[in-house]
Amino acid sequence: MKTFSNKVLTKPEAEQALDTAIALVRRNLPLYTDHCQNHSSVHDIYPQCENNQWTCGFWPGEVWLSYERTGDEAFKNTALTLVDSFLYRIEHKIEVDHHDMGFLYSPSCVAAYKLTGSEKGRKAAILAADQLCTRFQEKGEFFQAWGALGAADNYRYIIDCLLNVPLLYWASETTGDAHYADLAHKHVTTCLANSIRPDGSTYHTFFMDPVTGGPVRGATCQGYKDDSCWARGQAWGVYGTAISYRYTRRPEYLDAFRRVLAYYLERLPEDLVPYWDMTFTSGTEEPRDSSSASIVACGLLEAAKYVGNDEAAEYTKLAAQMLGSVAAHYAVKEGPQGIGLVRHGTYSKKSPYNTCTPEGVDECVSWGDYFYMEALTRLTKDWELYW
């Protein structure tokens, strides 16, 4: 595994960085209690939005992390107000015909249940798990990401779903119904069989045959091109395999973690924050994606719990080096109400070869803020994950 000489963020420095982030979250509470936070900033300031985006769960996660650190009831009250909104959303099926139930309901409602015993949070999260199960395709054994169920042009999954299926592992734990975890395992097995290339890089999306259920081809939506490696997709691969190993202890998941991590590390620039696609490694004006660094740091710190001491020490050091770079060069230290926590994220960059709509390029992105805080929290204590 590749190693680096970058500065390691110490525990006191992580605590200071976390407290700086929490101060910004506190300042933003009035803006995002009765509204949600947009998926990405505009000139570093997040517009308000209704609770109808796939990213709306990350801001409540930041608020819960702030509550964990401070014990301040102001954070708890805002987060519980948001739980009401998430329960309403899933009960009324508002923009939930997609696979992103984990991103929405784990950091908002599972967190609420774990931290406060909120029955509304538990109910909303179980309903969200039920909704995710409706996306499961028996032919191919995967959760269809987008579009009309069964439609040939959308008969595919995306690697991001590795962070959605933990909602199902949790649902099995809390209800005693193994069906949720069984579907999660089937999806992860399909994903790891098809989405990881021989060199450890990953496809963003993967099409399956709606008639036979067999694999068809990998493709990108938000990466540079089909055969490149979208940085955030690779990051989802790192963290998602670590979480699936946490719930299942299946050795093939840990093997996959090591493979995707090794590729990710080989393609990093000097400051350990990747460009938005890993086809770019240095000497380019292409934008970075700071969110990927924080996501991978979370995966490293989760995996460190389940490996030998030497390997765990390597993972912890790597995570602290990545977070040291983000904290020093990308994190916001102060700013007006509405400002994000981490600059230089990339939501969706158009290229001549991809199909995405350009949004949130070189901006703060809501998941980047959340995973930065989660990773810092992991460095400061033995954290019970929301996923």
Where are these regions (language model features)?
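Glycan-recognition and catalytic cores of secretory/periplasmic carbohydrate-active enzymes
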Residues: 1-387
